[in-house]
């Protein structure tokens, strides 16, 4: 990277922290990377968060209230979209929602000030894609386990004229099959775009500061102020994207449970 230049996509580079390129199983590299590290940190934070709020105190503290509030939020989401049958999916959807939320938030921490460079795992499609495939696999498993081959009736909307079935069925099937792709892509694009924008603005700040007083006030100061606003927006996006992912998972589970 040239001096004074900022590479907007360098922050997404997967770097090996432990192991070598020769560490592989079945042709897949298993070296410990920065992505794996921050996913492990996210998982640890999630476990500590839940464990700390699991204490059933008569007068709940703030930690317990936070855990119960987040759990209640996800539970209401399931009830609203699936009904009473949605309660059994609470552990999975809660874990999914909290993991994405914490991963998004940890990637926004200003740890570079102390020499630590946070990594947003959800800015990689391999991560968001796996999360989406997990949800899709559960949807398929529930659908076929509960309805058998009748699950295919999901792709023929009620009241469809018989002559239209050969046309409607493949369209509905294709739209169903692309769900995991769109689910993972949405989260990946949202997180990557925000981080790239922040990096570009930081480049303007650095360049404007090095260019002179006039450029500093014309480019660096406005870019810095815009960065503050974008950071606040990114915090909002981090929560919204976790919510959208959980919401769509609930909607897809409802299709498997109730065939609509």
From Swiss-Prot:
The answer, when asked if Transmembrane is one of the entry's keywords, is: yes
| Keyword set, alphabetical order | ATP synthesis, Cell inner membrane, Cell membrane, CF(0), Hydrogen ion transport, Ion transport, Membrane, Transmembrane, Transmembrane helix, Transport
- Note whether Transcription occurs among the keywords: no
Q: Where in the cell is it found?
A: Cell inner membrane
Question: Where's it mainly located?
Answer: membrane
Output the Gene Ontology cellular-component terms. plasma membrane; proton-transporting ATP synthase complex
User: Under what name is this protein listed?
Assistant: ATP synthase subunit a
**Phylogenetic lineage:** Bacteria, Pseudomonadati, Pseudomonadota, Alphaproteobacteria, Sphingomonadales
């Amino acid at each position: 990277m040239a001096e004074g230049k900022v590479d907007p996509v360098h922050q997404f580079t997967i770097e090996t922290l432990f192991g070598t390129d020769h560490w592989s199983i079945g042709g897949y590299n298993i070296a410990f990377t920065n992505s794996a590290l921050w996913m492990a940190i996210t998982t640890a934070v999630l476990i500590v968060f839940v464990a700390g709020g699991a204490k059933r105190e008569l007068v709940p503290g703030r930690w317990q209230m936070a855990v119960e509030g987040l759990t209640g939020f996800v539970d209401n989401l399931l009830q609203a979209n699936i009904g009473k049958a949605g309660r059994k999916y609470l552990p999975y959807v809660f874990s999914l929602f909290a993991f994405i939320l914490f991963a998004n938030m940890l990637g926004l921490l200003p740890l570079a000030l102390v020499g630590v460079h946070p990594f947003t795992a959800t800015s990689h499609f391999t991560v968001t894609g796996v999360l989406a495939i997990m949800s899709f696999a559960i949807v398929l498993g529930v659908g076929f386990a509960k309805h058998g081959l009748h699950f295919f009736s999901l792709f023929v909307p009620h009241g469809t004229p018989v002559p239209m079935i050969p046309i409607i069925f493949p369209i509905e099937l294709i739209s169903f099959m692309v769900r995991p792709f769109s689910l993972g892509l949405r989260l990946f694009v949202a997180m990557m775009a925000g981080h790239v924008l922040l990096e570009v603005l930081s480049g303007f700040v650095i360049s404007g500061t090095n260019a002179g007083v006039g450029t500093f006030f014309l480019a660096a100061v406005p870019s810095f102020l815009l960065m503050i606003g974008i950071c606040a927006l990114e915090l909002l996006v981090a929560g919204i994207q976790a919510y959208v992912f959980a919401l769509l998972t609930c909607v897809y589970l409802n299709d498997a449970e109730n065939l609509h």
